[in-house]
Design a protein with these regions (language model features):
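Mobile, glycine-rich extracellular loop/lid and propeptide segments
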Residues: 9-12, 38, 45, 85, ...
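Extracytoplasmic beta-rich repeat domains
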Residues: 17-38, 63-80, 103-127, 152-178
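Beta-propeller domains
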Residues: 2-16, 135-140, 163, 171-186
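Structural signature of WD-repeat beta-propellers
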Residues: 2-3, 32, 48-49, 88-89, ...
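Short loop/turn segments that connect beta-strands within beta-propeller blades
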Residues: 11-15, 57-61, 97-101, 143-147
Length: 186
């Protein structure tokens, strides 16, 4: 995606452009910074800088749906089993229906206090759990079907940056493998 919110699909081998589409918010200033994108077998899901998730067809870049979010995202959505999971700057994670874009559930994590790194980590998703990192240093394991809490942990106390500024953000994608989860915080 370029600075004008134009997203291009290019051939991997030749660089030939297959399609280009605008994924910003129509009628708004184009200076917002987006979060990222992910894909399944048929669609591309973009968290743009305008507090929206946009679903496009991979084949031609046609917009399938566009969902307004209650706050901006600064991470790529995670897609698995017909759900799109997106973390928001205000400490929420949402599960969206991948086919239609409606919100299935919302979980509000601990936002925390102090300074923040202006970005977020994407959630890690398995068949059984959504591992959601939050700016407060909280890591929550949620049930993918309804967002119910399986467990939570607070990974780090706030780190003093100097003066009164403190930060405790989780900035790396949690890794899930062989029945364990590993996450890094600031």
């Amino acid at each position: 995606m370029d600075s004008d919110n134009q997203l291009s699909c290019l051939d991997l081998q030749t660089g030939k452009r297959y399609w280009q589409v605008y994924v910003g918010a129509r009628g708004q200033d184009d200076t917002a910074v987006g979060g990222g994108m992910s894909a399944d077998n048929a669609r591309l899901y973009i968290a743009n800088g305008f507090a929206q998730v946009v679903a496009l067809t991979l084949e031609g870049g046609q917009e399938v749906w566009r969902t307004a979010l209650p706050a901006p995202s600064r991470s790529a959505p995670t897609v698995l089993d017909g759900r799109v999971y997106v973390t928001l700057l205000d400490g929420q994670i949402l599960a969206l229906d991948a086919q239609e874009g409606h919100v299935i559930w919302t979980y509000r994590g601990v936002l925390g206090e102090g300074a923040r790194v202006r970005g977020l980590s994407s959630p890690a998703v398995t068949a059984d759990l959504v591992i959601a990192p939050f700016p407060s240093g909280e890591l929550a394991a949620l049930r993918p079907d309804n967002g119910a809490v399986a467990w939570t942990d607070h990974l780090s106390p706030a780190v003093r940056l100097g003066g009164l500024s403190m930060v405790s953000d989780i900035r790396a994608l949690p890794v899930v493998s062989s029945g364990v989860v590993v996450a890094l915080s600031y």
